[in-house]
Amino acid sequence: MINDIKKDAQERMGKSIEALSRNLAAIRTGRAHPSILDSVKVTAWGSEMPLNQVAAITVEDARTLKIVAHDKNLSAAIEKAILTSDLGLNPSSAGTTIRVPMPALTEETRKGYTKQASGVAEDAKVAVRNVRRDALADLKKLTKDKEISEDEERRAADEIQKLTDKFVAEVDAAFKAKEKDLMAV
């Protein structure tokens, strides 16, 4: 039972870290990276589809992404989707190829993105701590129902705290890496 609680907590904390990674990847830096466009949805064939399912996205150079639509009729829809996304990008189209230059980030923009990354990291920490709270509540319930002793509960709670500390440290490390990436000129 205790192992199930710990395993569940570890899986849920891991999912929080995965979500953090996705959210941090969506915050753009000055460099071109295909994951910047992960949040872009294109209206294609009557439904909203992720951009990476309707086009090939490659890095042309350090500041330019190249997008080649799988279907040439989608080029205009892809360009519109990128323009209407809140990424602040201006694609230029040449036939079936769309180039997306990454504008240089100003100091003010960098600070804004760093603040956004900080908020995302804080949300991830809160999610990890909520998982800890749930796991500790489950342990308390087992102790109350006399399924485990108080000593076992205390030991398991210590292990869950260590797990929480480990995942919070991972969140901090991911944020520091993103902050360093954002502040690099």
Curated annotation (Swiss-Prot):
<dbReference type="InterPro" id="IPR002661">
    <property type="entry name" value="Ribosome_recyc_fac"/>
</dbReference>
<keyword id="KW-0963">Cytoplasm</keyword>
<comment type="function">
    <text>Responsible for the release of ribosomes from messenger RNA at the termination of protein biosynthesis. May increase the efficiency of translation by recycling ribosomes from one round of translation to another.</text>
</comment>
<dbReference type="GO" id="GO:0005829">
    <property type="term" value="C:cytosol"/>
</dbReference>
<dbReference type="GO" id="GO:0043023">
    <property type="term" value="F:ribosomal large subunit binding"/>
</dbReference>
<dbReference type="InterPro" id="IPR023584">
    <property type="entry name" value="Ribosome_recyc_fac_dom"/>
</dbReference>
<dbReference type="Pfam" id="PF01765">
    <property type="entry name" value="RRF"/>
</dbReference>
<dbReference type="GO" id="GO:0002184">
    <property type="term" value="P:cytoplasmic translational termination"/>
</dbReference>
<dbReference type="InterPro" id="IPR036191">
    <property type="entry name" value="RRF_sf"/>
</dbReference>
<protein>
    <recommendedName>
        <fullName>Ribosome-recycling factor</fullName>
    </recommendedName>
</protein>
<keyword id="KW-0648">Protein biosynthesis</keyword>
<comment type="similarity">
    <text>Belongs to the RRF family.</text>
</comment>
